[in-house]
Amino acid sequence: MKEQDHDRLLRIKTEGVREWQHQSSHYNRYEATPYSALEILFDEYDEWKSTDRFVDFGCGKGRFPFYVYHHLHASAVGVEMNGQLYQEAMENLAKYMERAKSSRASIQFEHIFAEGYDIEKEDNRFYFFNPFSLQIFQKVIDN
């Protein structure tokens, strides 16, 4: 299935690459994880539970949280520092919720730097797709 077909199925728009001018070298461009990679990840590691709570650091437009909820019915939090991407994730959430089978889909987005996100006790699965430098990664891990 093509990227746009997956997006259409989920009623979201996450395709594309976005370079940022005047951005710190610690934060990388926007590029969503390919759906084919997500399929491999979830096929390879089948120990996921619907009670898990996934946190996607550098979630961009939210592809990973929507994929997690749609396929596992697990909670997902997207953490995004870029205001424009955060807004697009929120627009995707509104579109997803319009036609979601459950109006209580547990997907949320936080507009905050990854190193500022407070890990909650429910958070037990963490996802990173090249969102930032090793220095920022270390700060997140220290949390």
Question: What spans do the regions from the language model cover?
Answer:
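A short, conserved alpha-helix within the catalytic core of class I
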Residues: 133-143
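Conserved SAM-binding motif I beta-strand of class I
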Residues: 75-80
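Conserved short alpha-helix immediately C-terminal to the canonical SAM/SAH-binding motif I
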Residues: 84-85
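Glycine-rich SAM-binding Motif I of class I
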Residues: 62-66
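Conserved class I S-adenosyl-L-methionine
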Residues: 51-60
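A short SAM/SAH-binding and catalytic strip from SAM-dependent methyltransferases
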Residues: 124-135
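S-adenosyl-L-methionine
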Residues: 1-50, 88-121
